[in-house]
Amino acid sequence: MAECDGKCDTCPSKNTCPDTKKLLAQQDAKIRENMSKIKHKIVILSGKGGVGKSTVTVNLAAALNLMGKKVGVLDADIHGPNIPKMLGVENTQPMAGPAGIFPIVTKDGIKTMSIGYLLPDDKTPVIWRGPKVSGAIRQFLSDVVWGELDYLLIDTPPGTGDEQLTIMQSIPDIDGAIIVTTPEEVSVLDVKKSIMMAKMLNIPIIGIIENMSGFVCPYCNKVVDIFGRGGGEKAAKELGVEFLGRIPLDIKAREASDKGIPMVLLDCKASEEFKKIVKRIVEKVEGKKE
């Protein structure tokens, strides 16, 4: 047997090595301890890229924060970490101590952790294979000192791969998954895959959000359905899950997002819809446990 180099995640013998099993059990115990301080854990999923899932995650967090909830956002998209930019806290490094890694806190009090905070700059790619990505996610879950939170939102990459599987199998008592889609038929096909994955892993479906549902004209305020309309609601009915609502495209919202300002802080149609959706989510999640 080759000499151990301590790199368990990429070791070909990790599934049979007693040392690895012991370390994973210890890490699982730390994850359970950390997650026990968080009332509600929600995974944000999308079947394909480009549907605005990270934008939805950030604005759900900001809307929950406006309701007085203590909120954290874990950016589990290791290869495409956009949360730091969207929350306006890029170019920031987390502090670490004996207790673990302390999350970055926005000026509004939202706690956040992302691989983006650990890279030298936003141009540096993360060129990792699946096992190392899964190991990084588990380390975030075990080592980040979230403290007591009302909600932890986990922003995942698109698809149904290693990252989603690692999160859903590592976090105990996940309240559910929110699926983000756009109105086109091609996006809706992928929604079904995300929902099937969650159901196979016994993760409840909180509901579907249809993003980019209509464009708000900046001149007349009329909503134009440039990507179609109703695909998310149709998928929800077909699959027997709740349709949470539609978020329109809005130039004001896009400009704010580029500056690291969540659109829920603006006076616009998208902000109104986000607040309605978050109210439905809170009623469903908290009502379920009470």
Curated annotation (Swiss-Prot):
One of its GO terms (molecular function) is ATP hydrolysis activity. The keyword ATP-binding applies. SUPFAM superfamilies: P-loop containing nucleoside triphosphate hydrolases (SSF52540). ATP binds at G47, K48, G49, G50, V51, G52, K53, S54. GO terms for cellular component: cytosol. Keywords: ATP-binding, Hydrolase, Iron, Iron-sulfur, Metal-binding, Nucleotide-binding. Signal peptide: none annotated. GO terms for biological process: iron-sulfur cluster assembly. The keyword Ribosomal protein does not apply. InterPro entries: Mrp-like_CS, Mrp/NBP35_ATP-bd, P-loop_NTPase, YlxH/NBP35. Binds and transfers iron-sulfur (Fe-S) clusters to target apoproteins. Can hydrolyze ATP. Belongs to the Mrp/NBP35 ATP-binding proteins family. Homodimer. This is Iron-sulfur cluster carrier protein. It comes from Methanocaldococcus jannaschii (strain ATCC 43067 / DSM 2661 / JAL-1 / JCM 10045 / NBRC 100440) (Methanococcus jannaschii).
